[in-house]
């Protein structure tokens, strides 16, 4: 009985998780403060939205298994990555307005990806505990000694 009470007290309720809009705004602020550092994660093969989510979960003390979030990434990266590549390749051939339109669409795809990650997160049984999500992710990328190391909780 005591173990059940302990488990119930440590379990994270869905309402404690970030909302899509709240997380989008938080991500924009955190990303904007150190955009180049977050882009370094991307250049090392990582996903910025995932890294931001893992950092946010660390701040909340919620550990998560990266493999549980992988399907959401696979689903959204199938659309996002080709669009990003197309935008980058077209940059020199487009006028400012056309390029900004492509960039705005990419940001909408980024927002969609965040929403899918959060939706996936809401389906998981999450518990409070020692959360080193960002550290583990950066370690997988070989980037744990990079510019974001000070964010590791």
Regions found by a protein language model. Give the residues of each.
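Short runs of predominantly hydrophobic/aromatic residues within well-ordered alpha helices
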Residues: 20-23, 46-50, 114, 131-134
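Short alpha-helical "patches" and their helix-cap loops
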Residues: 40-43, 63-79, 129-133, 153
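Structured binding/interaction patches within domain cores
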Residues: 60-117
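An acidic intrinsically disordered interaction segment
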Residues: 2-32, 78-88, 110
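Amphipathic alpha-helical segments within well-ordered protein domains
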Residues: 39, 54, 87-88, 118-122
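N-terminal interaction modules that seed assembly of large macromolecular complexes
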Residues: 32-70
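A charged, amphipathic interaction segment
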Residues: 92-153
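Contiguous interface-forming segments/domains that mediate binding rather than catalysis
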Residues: 2-23, 62-65, 96-106, 121-129
């Amino acid at each position: 009985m005591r173990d059940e009470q302990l488990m119930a007290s440590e379990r994270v309720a869905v309402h404690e998780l970030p909302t899509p809009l709240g997380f989008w705004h938080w991500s924009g602020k955190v990303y904007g403060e150190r955009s180049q550092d977050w882009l370094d994660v991307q250049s090392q093969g990582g996903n910025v939205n995932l890294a931001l989510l893992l950092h946010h979960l660390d701040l909340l003390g919620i550990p998560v298994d990266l493999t549980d979030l992988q399907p959401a990434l696979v689903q959204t990266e199938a659309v996002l990555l080709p669009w990003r590549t197309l935008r980058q390749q077209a940059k020199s051939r487009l006028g400012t307005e056309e390029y900004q339109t492509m960039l705005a669409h990419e940001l909408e795809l980024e927002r969609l990806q965040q929403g899918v990650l959060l939706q996936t997160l809401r389906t998981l049984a999450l518990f409070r505990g020692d959360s080193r999500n960002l550290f583990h992710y950066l370690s997988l990328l070989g980037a744990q000694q990079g510019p974001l190391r000070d964010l590791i909780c």
